[in-house]
A protein has these predicted regions:
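Short, small-residue-biased leader/transition segments that mark boundaries at the very start
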Residues: 1-2
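Short glycine-rich or small-residue beta-strand-to-loop segments that form or flank ligand, phosphate
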Residues: 5-20, 45-47, 73
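C-terminal binding/interaction regions
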Residues: 14-16, 21, 91-167
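Conserved active-site and cofactor/substrate-binding residues in soluble primary-metabolism enzymes
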Residues: 24-28, 32, 53-57, 67, ...
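Active-site rim loops that border cofactor/substrate pockets in soluble metabolic enzymes
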Residues: 30-63
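Structural signal for hydrophobic packing residues in well-ordered secondary-structure cores
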Residues: 33-41, 66, 114-122
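Short, structured active-site "lid" loops
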Residues: 61-79
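Amphipathic beta-strand/beta-sheet edge segments enriched in Tyr/Trp
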Residues: 78-98
Length: 167
């Protein structure tokens, strides 16, 4: 039997910030990731990571907390990483850096792929879109959201389990 898939949330996720950079509600993002995990037959749990706002480090912590060694990290603005605990912090299995281009279907696929990695499979990476105008269009807002996220970093606070329920 496979261990639970762990999703690591950034410090502001779902509390001080409740939507991604393109206004996708955080609860819908989580629902899709969880649905993808469950479609692969795995269970999940969520932790909030307080000591960093770097999505790669958040994902690595989630991977360390996961029995399978695979974790998902999500920043409040929507940037997401699938990580493996045996990889260096700044390496990863899949990186979704252009948050303005990540839709709910992509979040579901991220959950599915993370679960497949956890089961020892080698899935085809989730297709990502590229838009040359996304960076200049969202750069200022992205920086502002990251600053607000980073203000909530607490180097002395350990990751904590998060309970979620959906209406």
């Amino acid at each position: 039997m496979y261990k639970r898939q762990v999703i690591g949330l950034a410090p502001a996720f779902g509390t001080k910030q409740v939507k991604t950079i393109i206004d996708l509600p955080h609860d819908k993002v989580l629902r899709e990731i969880i649905a993808g995990i469950e479609e692969e037959g795995l269970k999940w749990r969520i932790i909030k990571v307080y000591h960093t706002s770097d999505v790669s480090f958040i994902a690595h912590v989630a991977a360390e907390y996961s029995g399978s060694g695979i974790g998902i990290g999500i920043q409040s603005k929507g940037t997401t990483v699938i990580h493996q605990k045996d990889l260096p912090n700044l390496s990863n299995l899949e990186l979704f850096s252009q948050a303005p281009l990540i839709d709910l279907d992509t979040y579901r696929k991220i959950g599915k792929n993370a679960a497949k990695y956890a089961k020892g499979e080698s899935p085809t990476p989730v297709p990502t879109r590229n838009d040359q105008m996304a960076r200049p269009t969202y750069q200022a807002l992205s920086a502002l959201l990251h600053i607000k996220e980073t203000e909530l970093v607490d180097n002395n606070k350990k990751p904590q389990a998060v309970t979620v329920s959906f209406q």
